Amino acid sequence: MTGKVLAVLIGSLLLGVGVNGFLVPHHLLDGGMIGIGLIMHYFYGWPTGLTMIFLSIPLYVLAWILERKYFFHSLHGLLVSSLFIDLFAPIEQGLQLGIFSSAIIGGLLVGCGIGLMLRYETSTGGTDLLAQLIHKFFSLNVGLLIFMIDGLVVLSGLKVIGLEKFMYSLLTITCVGLMTALCVIKRETIL
């Protein structure tokens, strides 16, 4: 239990820093619910974390009905990570790296945060939760589903962020995916 709590706290800290310190200053996107929250933030000025919570409500209702295990394993991750993303919003002014470095570092931090939570069988919910629910009924690969959803989210933000930032956002979601995969690999698999 302590490991899961620490994973949620540290993972959420990494998400908050990755999103606000590296993605937001350049108007870059991540995939999933974070990406949708960022699109709403860039377009309407809405708080990213709070937007993530509101947009996740239908998925959590569905999870409650179809598979309560997914509901309970991800609700705390969604709430804490959304809080940290909004608490760390002021740091977007502090770090001023180039867009290429920010896309990579932001993606690595976000991926590490998500991967750490997944390693301890929790998550931020959102589209990860959607992918798990789709997998339950259609036996499609969860990783592939998440990657496809992330790509669609970034593609949907193309008009808001423009082509150049879209390309850098593709680099970001690639880094997120790679780092997430590395974090969830069991230690004995690496050795």
Question: Model-found features: residue ranges?
Answer:
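Core subunits and conserved enzymes of cellular information-processing
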Residues: 1-191
